[in-house]
């Protein structure tokens, strides 16, 4: 893909390669995995561990995220540092629910940074920055799918400050529209997509295109 977008932010520009190695068990209810990303310029590097649980329309995900890009302003040289005051990683927990009615497949999710580099300016308290998100498939037919999403962010513990992990103050930080298509190439199917993302708070917008090249 041509960049890496996440919750209203452009994590990386340039050509980005993302990889995902996972194992699913317990009748598809539990998935553990490793997720990595890098860009063509070498200015973006990320390696994460994750756990996903699902049952019915409910889902729970815990991501241990470590972005060790060379230009990072935080600790990006100690992978196994889990000290709250000095770690360069963060733990992100998400509870989600997808309505199972065919005519109303709304997705709702609540994500909170529960540990790591989400501290106040004095590095004395965790802010527990939270991202609340809603997504709805507005079109799905003939191998095409279009999803619209909106997300807001705030800190559960402001710690005397307005800023949080996702922005400068509480508010809408993510509006998106994504079109996905299963492209047929002979005997192969390549999922491709195009996505527009807008951040009203930062007055920024981004466009992303991507494809899933290999799956096994």
Segment roles from a protein language model:
Residues 70-71, 84, 88, 98-106:
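Structured domain cores in non-transmembrane regions
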Residues 25, 99-193, 197-202, 207-216:
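Outer-membrane beta-barrel transmembrane domain signature
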Residues 27-83:
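Surface-exposed loop and membrane-interface regions of Gram-negative outer-membrane beta-barrel proteins
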Residues 1-39:
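Short glycine/proline- and aromatic-enriched beta-strand/turn motifs that initiate or cap beta-hairpins
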Residues 1, 53, 192-194:
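Transmembrane beta-strand segments of Gram-negative outer membrane beta-barrel proteins
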Residues 12-14, 44, 127:
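Short, surface-exposed loop/turn motifs at beta-strand boundaries within globular domains
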Residues 5-9, 21, 37-39, 50, ...:
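Outer-membrane beta-barrel proteins
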């Amino acid at each position: 893909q041509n960049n890496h977008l996440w919750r209203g932010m452009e994590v990386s520009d340039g050509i980005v390669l993302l990889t995902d190695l996972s194992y699913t068990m317990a009748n598809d209810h539990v998935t553990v995995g490793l997720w990595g990303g890098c860009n063509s310029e070498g200015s973006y590097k990320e390696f994460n561990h994750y756990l996903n649980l699902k049952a019915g329309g409910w889902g729970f995900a815990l991501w241990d995220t470590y972005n060790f890009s060379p230009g990072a302003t935080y600790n990006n040289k100690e992978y196994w540092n889990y000290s709250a005051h000095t770690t360069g990683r963060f733990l992100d927990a998400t509870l989600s629910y997808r309505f199972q009615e065919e005519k109303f497949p709304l997705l709702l999710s609540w994500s909170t940074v529960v540990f790591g580099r989400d501290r106040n300016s004095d590095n004395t308290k965790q802010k527990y920055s939270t991202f609340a998100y809603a997504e709805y498939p507005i079109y799905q037919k003939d191998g095409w799918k279009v999803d619209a999403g909106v997300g807001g962010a705030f800190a559960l513990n402001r710690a005397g400050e307005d800023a949080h992990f996702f922005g400068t103050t509480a508010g809408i930080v993510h509006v998106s529209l994504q079109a996905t298509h299963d492209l047929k190439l002979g005997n192969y199917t390549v999922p491709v997509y195009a996505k527009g993302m807008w951040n009203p708070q930062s007055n920024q917008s981004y466009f992303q295109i991507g494809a899933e090249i290999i799956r096994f």
